[in-house]
Amino acid sequence: MYSLIRPLLMRMDAERSHEFSLAWMDRLARLGLGRLLCGHRLPDMPRRVMGLTFANPVGLAAGLDKNGEHLEALGHVGFGFIEVGTVTPRPQPGNPEPRLFRLPAHEAIINRMGFNNQGVDALVQRLRVTRYQGVLGVNIGKNKDTPTERATDDYLSCLQKVYPYADYVAVNVSSPNTPGLRDLQGGELLEALLGRLTHLRGVLAREYGRYVPLVVKIAPDMDEAQRAHFCQQVLRYGIDGVAATNTTLSRDGVEDDPLAREQGGLSGAPLRPRAQAVLEELGQRLGHRVPLIGVGGIMSGADAQARMAAGADLLQIYSGFIYRGPLLLEELLKAVAPEH
């Protein structure tokens, strides 16, 4: 069904197209036609990672359902897990429009959304009543007007509020669209953030009687020394997983596109080699001590196989889902099935 409406979606403004697609999916789900959102029957491929059981290893990355408004509809697609957010302590509108650009010739997207979301309290209200039964990740960040030196307070506030409802929490310190955010990926700022988050997680685990894993999502634009320090701190503080990678500021592979001059993070096919290389390095540095989530530029079954070979335990898609729809999920799962 996605192939029938894709030409229309590609002619629409990118942000309106995403909104229309989600509304259309919601309507099908409400009418009891959610089965139409999935391709053929998907293989049963349960995975045990971070103490959680995933129906299959391919999930939806954060960014598509920022406020947890579409979980039931997206749940029909067949993802092994869904990550909502990024959510911040207070609502914020994000950056001015236009802020989302498709580069179809390159199967790429440039976004400078800026963590537009309704705030963590609105998300929690929805998570309390959701009928979605799969593994749920919540991606948390800081408000734009929060000074970098106080950013940790924003993450702690979000963690405390989403903890009872999240199966895991993803800490977003790598979006290029919030000033100063990437400073949190290294040095004393990273150490303070991870130290305080893991301490609070321990307190909350005792309070609620359940352990919620922490995943940190990193940028593809760090240098080797920064990645080495990051891995040291991940091991030091017992972080449960690393998602590699977020979008890139590089324009490698799209230099000839008129939209390449737009500010923001680049995702999709051009991100593939950079995200693959970072994942391979993390796999070597962390070994099997920390689970890895491969994300960024996964557009085909071959891409999925390459990420798994590099050490990924799980995969996430976003741009590939925008361009290929649910059929991509089917292709990825077939590619990483045990018989392959």
Curated annotation (Swiss-Prot):
| Recorded metabolic or biological pathway in which this protein acts | Pyrimidine metabolism; UMP biosynthesis via de novo pathway; orotate from (S)-dihydroorotate (quinone route): step 1/1
Q: What class of enzyme is it?
A: oxidoreductase
Q: Which GO terms describe its biological process?
A: 'de novo' pyrimidine nucleobase biosynthetic process; 'de novo' UMP biosynthetic process
Q: Which reaction does it catalyse?
A: (S)-dihydroorotate + a quinone = orotate + a quinol
The UniProt entry, under Pfam families, shows:
DHO_dh
Q: What are the required cofactors?
A: FMN
- Record carries keyword Nucleotidyltransferase: no
Entry's EC annotation: 1.3.5.2
Q: What is its main location?
A: membrane
Locate the residues binding FMN: A62, G63, L64, D65, K66, T86, N139, N172, K217, T245, G268, G297, Y318, S319
User: Which Gene Ontology cellular component terms are annotated?
Assistant: cytoplasm; plasma membrane
The places in or outside the cell where this protein is found are:
Cell membrane
Q: Which residues form the active site?
A: S175
- Give residues annotated as binding substrate: K66, N111, R112, M113, G114, F115, N172, N177, N246, T247
Q: How is the cofactor bound?
A: Binds 1 FMN per subunit.
> Which SUPFAM superfamilies would you find in this protein's record?
FMN-linked oxidoreductases
Per the record, the similarity remark reads: Belongs to the dihydroorotate dehydrogenase family. Type 2 subfamily.
Fill in the subunit field for this protein: Monomer.
| PANTHER family for the chain | DIHYDROOROTATE DEHYDROGENASE (QUINONE), MITOCHONDRIAL, DIHYDROOROTATE DEHYDROGENASE (QUINONE), MITOCHONDRIAL-RELATED
Biological role: Catalyzes the conversion of dihydroorotate to orotate with quinone as electron acceptor.
Alphabetical list of HAMAP family matching this protein:
DHO_dh_type2
Q: What name appears for this protein in its UniProt entry?
A: Dihydroorotate dehydrogenase (quinone)
* Natural source organism: Alkalilimnicola ehrlichii (strain ATCC BAA-1101 / DSM 17681 / MLHE-1)
